[in-house]
């Protein structure tokens, strides 16, 4: 009887070990795979290589998610504005109506504001149903969680250099044009990683588009790959690959992230750290909407104040 129990335990441990190892697998080859129109099976196989993949995504969501339609129908709903120059301790988002947010982004002289983390906006406007009905081709097998986001940006603005921990991570351009700069996980040691467990964000303090003097030596040790995406193109970025999105034109990006049951188990320590962080940290965002009463001023500067 004891032998049988020990054997069952061994099989369970072996099963978990193999699946967790598979989930945490990385690939450091600095190249991107381009496919015209992959089948569902081909996409799954190639994604498991853990290399970036670029392909065309012909889907109705491309004709629905654009500035004109959202401005006409959902301009009163709040999106979240982020100052990408803020440090970890002030990593919060400012809610503004879509109309106000677009004005801010358009007139931001310093190009330091972007819009992301807009799950609430998608839910309140019911646009999340469009995402949910358009991503069956992208969803991996045994998916446990789907995370959707909407990113907005104007020319010359860009996101932080960061990575994601989920099993699948796709970015679809539905309007405009962007450049994505990528580097594989092996370069993490040169990127001065900042972990914000409260929102599960893992970003580099290095500005990959305008490298600070103090990081020049580290930057010279890494190699990056730039890829341009236009409307209708989608890219898969593997977990732990650093990426930054720079907007060439006024653009909207749909972000699809997926976690499977085994992926959730593999990154369980990150969720535990998030619980601890949220229990020990209390932050309050002050109401500063009055700061943008004159959005067309020469120099727009919104501060994220935390008490």
What are these language model-derived features?
Residues 1-234, 242-307:
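N-terminal accessory scaffold of Fe(II)-dependent oxygenases
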């Amino acid at each position: 009887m004891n032998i049988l129990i020990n054997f069952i335990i061994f099989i369970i441990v072996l099963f978990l070990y193999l699946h967790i190892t598979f989930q945490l697998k990385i690939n450091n080859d600095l190249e991107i795979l381009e496919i015209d129109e992959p089948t569902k099976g081909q996409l799954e196989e190639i994604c498991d290589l853990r290399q970036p993949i670029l392909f065309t995504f012909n889907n109705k969501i491309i004709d629905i998610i654009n500035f004109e339609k959202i401005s006409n129908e959902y301009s009163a709903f709040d999106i979240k504005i982020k100052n990408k120059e803020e440090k970890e301790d002030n990593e919060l988002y400012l809610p503004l109506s879509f109309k106000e947010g677009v004005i801010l982004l358009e007139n931001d002289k310093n190009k330091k504001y972007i819009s992301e983390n807009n799950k609430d906006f998608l839910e309140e406007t019911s646009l999340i149903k469009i995402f949910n009905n358009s991503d069956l081709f992208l969803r991996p097998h045994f998916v446990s969680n789907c995370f959707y986001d909407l990113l907005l940006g104007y020319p010359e603005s860009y996101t932080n250099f960061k990575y994601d921990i989920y099993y699948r991570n796709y970015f679809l351009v539905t309007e405009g044009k962007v450049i994505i700069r990528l580097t594989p996980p092996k370069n993490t040691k040169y990127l001065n990683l900042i972990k914000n467990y409260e929102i599960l964000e893992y970003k580099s303090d290095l500005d990959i588009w305008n490298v600070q003097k103090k990081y020049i030596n580290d930057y010279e040790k890494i190699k990056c790959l730039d890829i341009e995406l236009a409307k209708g193109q989608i890219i898969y970025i593997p977990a732990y690959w650093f990426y930054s999105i720079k907007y060439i034109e006024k653009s909207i990006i749909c972000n699809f992230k997926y976690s499977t049951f085994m992926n959730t188990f593999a990154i369980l320590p990150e969720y535990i750290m998030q619980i601890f962080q949220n229990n020990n940290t209390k932050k309050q965002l002050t109401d500063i909407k009055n700061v943008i009463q004159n959005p067309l001023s020469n120099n727009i500067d919104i501060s994220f104040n935390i008490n």
